Amino acid sequence: MSIPAGKNEMPAIHPGEILREEYLKPMGLSAHALAKALHVSPSRINEIVREQRGITADTALRLVRYFGGDAQSWLNMQTAYDLKMAEQDKQSINIIIPLSTDARNVEL
């Protein structure tokens, strides 16, 4: 499920949606079959395709070994999604008082 974006922004897309829609469905592959092929628990893949769990480095490497491609792409998708989700909670971020400009220039 994509998270709606603001004006001129791309929506946040969970990597599980990509896995489900671009890999599993077109190939007629079930989450359970993929889990078996990747030697991981079925719950891991099910949670990813249901967008309830993120892609880890380990999962990215396993997906790339099976499907081909680039592990960094899977991790970048996850990071982009995580950032979009975090940005939606601006209220908790906006209460942080930034370090003053003068203090930022001090070497530690």
From Swiss-Prot:
Residue ranges the record marks as coiled coil: none
HTH cro/C1-type domain mapped to chain residues: 19-74
Keyword Aminoacyl-tRNA synthetase: no
SUPFAM superfamilies cross-referenced by the UniProt entry: lambda repressor-like DNA-binding domains
PROSITE patterns: HTH_CROC1
A Pfam match: HTH_3
Keywords, in A-Z order: DNA-binding, Virulence
Alphabetized SMART domains for the sequence: HTH_XRE
Matches recorded under InterPro entries: Cro/C1-type_HTH, Lambda_DNA-bd_dom_sf, Toxin_antidote_HigA
GO MF entries: DNA binding
DNA-binding region: 30-49
Family membership: Belongs to the VapA/VapI family.
UniProt protein name: Virulence-associated protein I
Biological source species: Dichelobacter nodosus
